[in-house]
């Protein structure tokens, strides 16, 4: 039996809500978390596609490095510091971006994220919960809250427009020892589905990216146990997907009007197995829990 595409599993809504023309070529784009990893890869690829890119990151030096990389390659780019967990920062990002573009953005990518894991529920420090949810969930909430009205109000000449929210296969995988991260990404998935429904019939497309392991620095910069960090590093090497490839696949999916983007085979398999055989999936995850958690 062939694997089902995410839109087929959940019905035709994924495509019906999003059908439009290309958004990622020549975009006026705002990318959060653009200082490294998938965010930097998004910025570089958008620059290659002729876009002007606002590279935003809480690490201002990293944001400037990405922007400099783009300008060296002939693209237009600027760096702006932004802590996405703070709505005032996101409002300032929107204001500065529009001033630099001299127009409303045509594409917003809510990518900034952090990682935490390695302990079961009840042992994860509440400060870690607040930190992860503050960046991973409240960041996209702030981004959608601030930028959606701006995209709605943009002139028709600026259509099509789009929002890409970066979630993770953790949104549906329920991997043990990663509760805070899982919950944050499940929230981003639901946020994206709701936003797509609300924007149905407009020129604004929504795509949610749900990758598995990608070669980024999220393990080094996160609050993750030594055992879990070693496992994650091994899986990142095994997946074979670079951040650049994930960014390209996601931007192409967005141009097609796909609501869901699961770039890797293991993400697609996990998506399908959980929906076609949820009991089997949960038992398998339980076995993994007994072998990976202390």
Annotate each language-model stretch with its function.
Residues 28, 35-36:
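Conserved glycine-rich cofactor-binding loop
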Residues 168:
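Residue(s) in the substrate-gating loop at a strand-loop-helix junction
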Residues 51-65:
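Conserved glycine-rich Rossmann-like NAD(P)H-binding loop of the short-chain dehydrogenase/reductase
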Residues 119-121, 125-130:
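Substrate-binding pocket helix/loop in short-chain dehydrogenase/reductase
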Residues 201-265:
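SDR active-site lid
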């Amino acid at each position: 039996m062939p694997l089902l595409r995410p839109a087929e599993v959940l019905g035709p809504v994924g495509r019906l809500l999003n059908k439009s023309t290309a958004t990622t070529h020549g975009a006026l784009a705002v990318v959060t978390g653009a200082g490294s990893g998938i965010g930097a890869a998004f910025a570089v690829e958008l620059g290659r596609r002729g876009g002007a890119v606002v590279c935003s990151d809480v690490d201002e030096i990293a944001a400037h490095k990405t922007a400099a990389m783009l300008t060296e390659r002939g693209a237009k780019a600027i760096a702006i510091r932004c802590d996405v967990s703070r709505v005032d920062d996101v409002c300032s990002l929107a204001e500065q971006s529009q001033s630099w573009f001299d127009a409303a953005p045509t594409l917003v990518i809510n990518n900034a994220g952090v990682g935490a894991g390695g302990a079961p529920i009840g042992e994860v420090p509440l400060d870690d919960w607040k930190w992860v949810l503050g960046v991973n969930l409240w960041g996209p909430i702030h981004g959608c809250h601030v930028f959606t009205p701006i995209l709605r109000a943009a002139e028709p000449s600026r259509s099509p427009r789009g929002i890409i929210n970066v979630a993770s296969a953790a949104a549906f995988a329920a991997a043990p020892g990663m509760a805070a991260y899982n919950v944050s990404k499940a929230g981003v998935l639901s946020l994206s589905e709701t936003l797509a429904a609300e924007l149905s019939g407009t020129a604004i497309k929504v795509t949610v990216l749900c990758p598995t392991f990608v070669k980024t620095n999220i393990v080094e910069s996160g609050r993750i146990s030594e055992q879990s960090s070693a496992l994650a590093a091994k899986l990142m090497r095994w997946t074979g997907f670079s951040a650049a490839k994930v960014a390209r696949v996601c931007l192409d999916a967005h141009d097609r009007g796909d609501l869901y983007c699961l770039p890797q085979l293991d993400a697609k398999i996990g998506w399908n197995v959980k929906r076609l055989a949820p009991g089997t999936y949960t038992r398998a995850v339980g076995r993994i829990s007994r072998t990976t958690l202390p």
